[in-house]
Amino acid sequence: MGCESPKNTENVDLLTSKAENLQYSQVFLPDSQIIESSTLPSELNHAIKSKFNKQSLIPIKFFEITEEEFNSILNRNELVDNIIKLYSSQLDEIEYEIDVKYREIPPIKVLDPKGGIQYYKGGFNRQGECHGKGIWVKDYNIYIGNFRNDEFYGIGLFITEQGNYYFGNWKNSQCNGYGSLMMDKKLVYQGNFKDSKKEGYGEERYPDGDIYKGAFYDGEKNGKGQYIFADGSRYDGNFRNSKYSGFGQISLRGGDSIRGEFKDGKLNGDGDFTWVDGTKFVGNFVDDKKNGEGIYVWSNGKSFKGNWNNNVIYGNGLIKNPNNGTQESIIIN
């Protein structure tokens, strides 16, 4: 790096020091913080899809069982009991109707020719399909709720063998409408679904404490949203396929902020940094790096206007000091 006879070495030293600090400081949140969104956990999705294989119960061999045997299967452990109790107010009506309306219909044990054993207690239609309110158990997966023509339909609670569960609206045995998804005894998503994918407004929570609030489409973060990091930092703006995309702003915990156009999770195009001490940089970025023309303005009013290539200052530049009315041109090779 060389300079052409700078009139004031203090300005150059200040510029160099500030530029080096900015060049190597971690001003962006690491990519690893952006957790890719997904549809329902595969374990839950598989359990839902393994239901009736689109067959009615009539051609499948089934046996009556006692209420005691059915209840022992349903209440297989304390975890399931606690989950059911959590939604007792919503499930009371369903369980009451099963007890009263279907009192004369015994629970059944179903031998599925495609494998597995199913248990069911509830209503049927004339075709022998599960219809109305009922309780269904298969491979330690439990569904308590409404059925229509052998499909989960309406409000229902689905509990997996591992104790993860979904409570909310169903249509055609898919999560459709508003619902809550719990994993490892913690709420991981609350919001809207379409065909078992997150769609519409929702709130997603992550194991490390991060939270996303905003729009989803096809199971991914798409549209406007807010990603709040566990340390208090946050991103407000647009997303595409679960990455920063479009205009957005990152507000860091210490008070610094980054604002501009993002693409594929990185700053691309016009943007600006504002530090808590009042220092500001405005310029062009490519993949999170300063590229092209930009200007630094320090809190004391001094400024430097110049060019960058991959975060490195090069070429002609102009330093201004409005406090004493001086300015100087420099060349950095």
What are these regions (language model features)?
Residues 1-333:
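Intrinsically disordered, low-complexity repeat tracts enriched in Gly/Pro/Ser/Thr and acidic residues
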